[in-house]
């Protein structure tokens, strides 16, 4: 799958209507759904959340959750829809998401993450990927990030969408977490250098695809977020 240009998952933004519009503007873009919790898929009519029938672009379904069995079940449901990839959210820092023990807080529990992903991969008909931050709170973005990525790579995860900031889980709301923690693009570039066999797609603060494509030519793709609708 071509991930050179991706539109990030954004709550209350990347619904199927917005994705349809993005598809009109660019046939090359890889699109993401909003994050959908596994329980929402499992306890309702799946098509209410997963219908993607009018989207021609490659589309990634992003799922949230921390229960391996629930994530496995949601992945099974997703197989009947035309998604190119299933992505586990490991980067959302909101307090509501934290209280449900999913999103960025899971970066503190690599063993649980591995269990979740292993169950998803057992049933997924397409690739399973992750979206991460450089770390959370006082996470060591050199040693701990490398260890985290290495652990997931060892179980078969090959694609990492990396928001080039840490997530601060206390004291900042999601909007502040998109702007206050400093960007560290060099750390993402180093991650690719150290794990050259993995697909590394960079996200965070990117508002010009052409300049980013040049700056990050050694990476496997560019992901834009707010720049997709703030113009």
Which residue ranges define each predicted feature?
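Flavin-dependent oxidoreductase catalytic cores
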Residues: 1-231
């Amino acid at each position: 799958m071509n991930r050179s240009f991706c539109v990030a998952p954004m709550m209350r933004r990347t619904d199927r209507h917005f994705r349809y519009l993005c598809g009109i503007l660019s046939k090359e873009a890889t699109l993401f759904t909003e994050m959908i919790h596994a329980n929402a898929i499992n306890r309702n009519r799946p098509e209410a959340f997963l219908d993607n029938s009018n989207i021609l672009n490659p589309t990634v379904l992003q799922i949230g959750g921390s229960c391996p069995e629930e994530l496995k079940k949601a992945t099974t449901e997703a197989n009947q829809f035309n998604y190119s990839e299933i992505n586990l959210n490991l980067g959302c820092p909101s307090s509501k998401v934290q209280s449900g023990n999913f999103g960025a807080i899971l970066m503190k529990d690599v063993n649980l993450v591995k269990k979740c992903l292993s169950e998803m991969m057992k049933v997924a008909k397409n690739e399973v990927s992750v979206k991460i931050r450089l770390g959370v709170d006082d996470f060591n973005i050199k040693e701990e990030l490398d260890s985290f990525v290495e652990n997931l790579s060892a179980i078969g995860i090959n694609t990492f969408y990396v928001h080039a900031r840490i997530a601060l889980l206390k004291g900042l709301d999601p909007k502040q977490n998109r702007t206050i923690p400093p960007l560290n693009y060099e750390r993402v570039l180093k991650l690719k250098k150290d794990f050259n066999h993995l697909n590394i797609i960079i996200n965070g603060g990117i508002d010009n695809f052409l300049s980013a494509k040049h700056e990050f030519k050694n990476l496997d793709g560019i992901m834009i977020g707010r720049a997709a609708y703030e113009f």
